[in-house]
Regions:
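An N-terminal hydrophobic leader/cap segment in hydrolases
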Residues: 26-55, 62-65
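Short beta-strand element of the alpha/beta-hydrolase
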Residues: 74-82
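Conserved alpha/beta-hydrolase
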Residues: 94-116
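Alpha/beta-hydrolase active-site loop
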Residues: 119-139
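Alpha/beta-hydrolase fold nucleophile elbow
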Residues: 141-152
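Hydrolase active-site cap/lid region
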Residues: 160-217, 265-270
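Short beta-strand/loop motif that positions the catalytic acidic residue
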Residues: 221-222, 227-230, 234
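Conserved alpha/beta-hydrolase "acid-adjacent" motif
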Residues: 235-241
Length: 286
């Protein structure tokens, strides 16, 4: 059982609000389900941290946590969380990395946690760029050893961002877990799964802004190494999304299918923590 109020305690908590929201409003912003509640702070689980405030390029005040590596840092992980709650729950996926000598920067998108503003796909892209810019302005971060890790919506955002980022030369690798391939496709799937919205799946999904979808741009990640992680029992974002992204991506690329794995659940398993550490060590060896 997870020691945190994780965002996927109940997968239906993610699925049902998305279905209902799309049915009612038919706009891309339904992909964002932010909360401002602070469930915990890193010191409550024995982690040192820094409260970081920085501005997005359009002036929105953003908040995040920097978890410093214990001992000499091997690198820095820029962690992009999923669509629900905020960093105070999603820390559950990365809390173990500082003990393995990695800094972790967890920004909240606008509208989440203590970040100001209202969430949007365009705004989230600005926020990711600003988070990267913040890291590159810090003297305590090795600017040549930054890896981006995105889960679920954060993975979809990360793919689009890395393909277009003004800082892509500083992204040593991109890792996604449970990322969906296309906003309209995932919307259709959720609408199809609920009897009330089933007849509306096609007309409503066509109202979704697909401009920021990862599938058309994932081939532009190259030559940055791409690792796609996906559970074969993911009921929120089916494995087919990860497979489609992998098929469309250019080399260098790698895919891990987590046997029996649900949504953003790989790093609950010690074996995948060990695999990730080995991957990071290999990527950052030069």
């Amino acid at each position: 059982m997870c020691a945190f109020p994780c965002s996927n305690i109940s997968e239906m908590r993610l699925l049902f609000p998305l279905v209902l929201a799309i049915s009612l409003s038919a706009c891309t912003n339904v992909f964002f389900q932010p909360q401002q509640i602070q469930y915990l702070t890193p010191d409550q689980i024995g982690l040192a941290y820094e409260d970081v405030y920085f501005n997005s390029s359009d002036g929105v005040r953003l908040h995040g946590w920097l978890l410093p590596a214990q001992g000499k840092a091997k690198g820095t992980i820029l962690f992009l969380h999923g669509n629900a709650e905020n960093i105070t729950t999603h820390i559950a996926s990365v809390y173990w990395l500082p003990a393995q000598h990695y800094n972790v920067f967890l920004p909240d998108y606008r509208g989440y946690g203590r970040s100001e503003g209202s969430p949007s796909l365009e705004g989230a892209q600005e926020d990711i760029n600003s988070a990267m810019s913040h890291l590159l302005q810090r003297s305590d971060i090795d600017h040549e050893r930054i890896v981006m890790l995105g889960q679920s919506l954060g993975g979809a955002l990360a793919i689009y961002n890395t393909a277009h980022s003004p800082y892509r030369s500083k992204i040593k690798a991109l890792i996604t877990e449970s990322a969906f391939s296309d906003y309209r496709s995932i919307a259709r799937e959720k609408l199809d799964s609920f009897w009330l919205s089933w007849p509306l799946q096609w007309p409503l999904s066509l109202t979704i802004d697909n401009d920021y979808s990862p599938l058309p741009v994932v081939n532009k990640i190259s030559p940055i190494p791409l690792l796609i992680i996906h559970g074969d029992k993911d009921k929120v974002v089916p494995l087919a999304h990860g497979q489609a992204l992998y098929a469309a991506a250019a080399q260098p690329k790698e895919m891990w299918v987590v046997e029996g794995g649900g949504h953003i659940a790989a790093f609950r398993r010690k074996e995948y923590q060990i695999k990730l550490l080995a991957y990071l060590q290999d990527i950052l060896k030069n």
